[in-house]
Amino acid sequence: MENRKWLDGQAYADLVSLCQFLPGPASSQVGMAIGLSRGGFAGALLAWLGFTLPSAILLILFGLQFHHFQGSFGSWLHGLKLVSVAVVAQAILAMGKPQFSDWRKTALAAASAGAAIGFPSLWMQIAIIASGGLSGLVLLDSHRMLPSEPIRNIPGRKTGLFLLSSFFFLLAALPVIASLSGSYPLRLFDSFYRAGALVFGGGHVVLPLLQSQVVPNGWVSNSEFLAGYGAAQAVPGPLFTFAAFLGAVSSGTPSGWTGAAIALVAIFLPSFLLVAGILPFWNDLRLIPPVQRIMKGINSAVLGLLIAAFWNPVCTSSIRSEFDVMLAAAAFLLLLKLPSWAVVLSTVLIAGIFKF
C-alpha cells in the first residue's frame, strides 16, 4: 500500500476493520478487498490466488505424501502435532489479552469454553457464537468511531445485496442439498463452506469448526488433522489453506488435488461473498453501537471455542508423555523469539531424534 499508493492509510485501516468484523480469514479478506477496489471481481480473484496458492500447493503436496511419511517418519509427524499445541496456546494468549482485562468478556469466554467441552458438536458451537453475540449486545459497551472517506470502486448496493443473499442462501441450502443428494463432493463443499462462514476471529479459530466437520465424519483422522495443522505453521500464507491439506488426505472420493480444490474454494467463498457484499454498506454499518457490542461478544465466545479446542483435540491427541509436555512448552517459548517455520523444523527434528 505504501509503495504503490493504491489506498491511503485511512482507507486501508477501514478495510482491516471490516475484515476483523466479518467471519473468515482477515488477511485474505483484506487482499480480496484491495483486489476488488483495483480490478473488480477479476482483481479480487487474482489477489486471492496470488496470496493463497503458494501455501496451498505446499500443503497439498505434503498431504499427497502423508501416508508414506506416516509409516516412515511417525515420530517426526508427532513433532508437528506438538507444534500445534504450542501454536494454539500462543493464539489463546494473543486473543485473550483484550478479553481478560474485562471480567464480563472473561466470564463469557469461560462459559463458552465450558459449554464447548461439555457438549462438543457443531450445533453447540453455532449456539455458542449466537449466544456470545446476544450477550455482547446486552452486557458489553460500544465505542465511538469517526466517519471516514468511503472506499472507491466497490460494487453497488444492489450487487452487494445479491452477494449477501447468496452467502446466506448457500449457508442454509447446502446442508439440505448435500444431505438429500448423498454426494460426497457436495458434503465436502458444504462442510468447508460452513466452517468458512462461521469462523469469527479467523486463523486458529477455524480449528474447532474444521475438526467438528471432518473428524467425526471419518474423512480425516485426528492424527492426520493435527499433523497437517502443524505443517500449516511452517508455510507462508493464510492458515485457511489448511483446508487444502484436509481435502487432499480425505478418505472420500474425490481426494487428492480435486478434493483439495473443492475444500479450498469452499472455505474461502464465504469470505468473498461477505467482503464484496458488505463493502457498499460498511461505512454506515461500522458506526452502529449495537453492531460493535455484538461483535465484541462474538469475539469472546470464539476465544472460548479456541480454549475448548486446545484441550480437545489438540492436547488430548498430542500429549503422551512428560517429554511431549516439555517439548511443546519449549516450542511455545521459541515462538516468542523465532519465526514459526524455524520452530516447526526444530520441534520436528527433536521429536524425531528422541523418539527413535
What are these regions (language model features)?
Residues 1-22, 33-356:
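Multi-pass membrane proteins that catalyze or facilitate reactions on polyprenyl-/lipid-phosphate substrates
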Residues 25:
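N-terminal cofactor/phosphate-binding cores enriched in small/glycine residues
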